[in-house]
Structures are given as structure tokens and as C-alpha cells.
Amino acid sequence: LNIDNPLDNGKKVSIEVTRSSAKKDIVLHNDGGLGILIEIYMEGDIGNKQGTGNLTSEEVIPKLQFQLEKLIENEVRHTVELAQNVYKSDIFGFGEIVRKSYPQYWEEISDWNEIFSGLPLELKVVAKIRGSGLLSES
């Protein structure tokens, strides 16, 4: 994953994902409506960098993590929106969660893909950068 180098304008930093997990769920709101919940956790190391500066400093790591979280959030949000608005298809299997978790609701609906297309998305992304995978900082 490539993000901006906060210490050198116009330069990039690549993050090598070393660990990741994702959870998806359907939430039932107080008003009886459903929503999509996706939680993503990832860890990574700084792979390559363009430009100069110490990217592993305590001041810079949070900036990189924030950028990484926003990048992942934007990509996931875009993918879900495509499935909902363009393809109108639940390619993620949220309908199966509804069927298992809310069987009575499932029995009452007729067109899941139509319902899926209108569900709000709640997305939580946590990205941790552990350090540098580079042999040396230059």
C-alpha cells in the first residue's frame, strides 16, 4: 500500500502488510433498521520510501497510520458502494448473517439485494505501523 511521505512533499512510502483481520456484521438499530458494520485491523512495516527523513519517529508514525486508515477506509467504502449502487448485489454475504442472526426478519423480506443496496455502512479501521522493514534508514 502506498501513502504520502509526510516528511517529503510529493514522495511516497510503501507499507508492507504483515498482519490483517476483518470482521463483518449486521447491526439492528433501535428504529428496527439494519446497517452494515465492517471492522478492519492491520499491521504493517514501512517497506520502501521516497525522500528523506526518519519515518519511524514517534511524531511521524501516527501520521502514517492515519493516512493508511483513510486509504483502507476509502477503498472499502468504494467497493461496498459499487456493490450496493452499481451491481446491486451482496457479494459480501451480509444476507447470510441476516438469515442466521435475524431469521424472523429474513422470512419477512422479499428482495434482499434491494434492501442491501440501501443499508448504511459503518466502517472502523485501525492500522498499526510497527516500524521499518528497511535494512537501513537513509
Model-based region annotation:
Residues 1-138:
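Active-site environment of non-heme Fe oxygenases that use a 2-His-1-carboxylate facial triad
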